[in-house]
């Protein structure tokens, strides 16, 4: 069985390759993009039995068209993988959402997160997206097995003082400043992010 792994962006294809231990390409590279067009097309099709396309929520209708023209549907099977909470295509159309909504294709929904199991931010984002309550109202709450996401409730008057205090604790604990992000509910004034 011959197969290829691809994703719409360089970063997504790198993550896919690192995670699987297999070579993964951008869809443009898979299709042999040049300024004159795509090397693989309806006349000269991809030679694979299977394609796995990750992060396909970012796949626009134009690139999807070129990808589908470059395969023989009698020979090649495609598995499109996406997280519906991820960003959509920045170009026209939302190919994957349209395919799902059409109900013309089999869809399997995965509900357990494996790759980020210990990540607090992913846990909070998932709980929030699924409507689960995650804040207990205790003032300071820490999330994740590796305690990498901290929620601190404070008054408007004490926000700057609290941020400085917590930031200093993180620096004193040896955490690289590049790994620290402070999120506030405003983007204006001296307290904005």
Predicted stretch roles:
Residues 2-49:
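Inter-Walker segment of RecA-like/P-loop motor cores
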Residues 31, 58-60, 87-88:
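Catalytic P-loop NTPase motifs of RecA-like helicase/translocase cores
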Residues 54-55, 82-84:
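Walker B catalytic acidic pair
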Residues 51, 59, 79-80, 182:
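Hydrophobic positions in the central parallel beta-sheet of the AAA+
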Residues 84-193:
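Conserved helicase motor core of P-loop NTPases
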Residues 36-49, 59-60, 68-76:
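Short basic/glycine-enriched coil/helix segment immediately N-terminal to the Walker B
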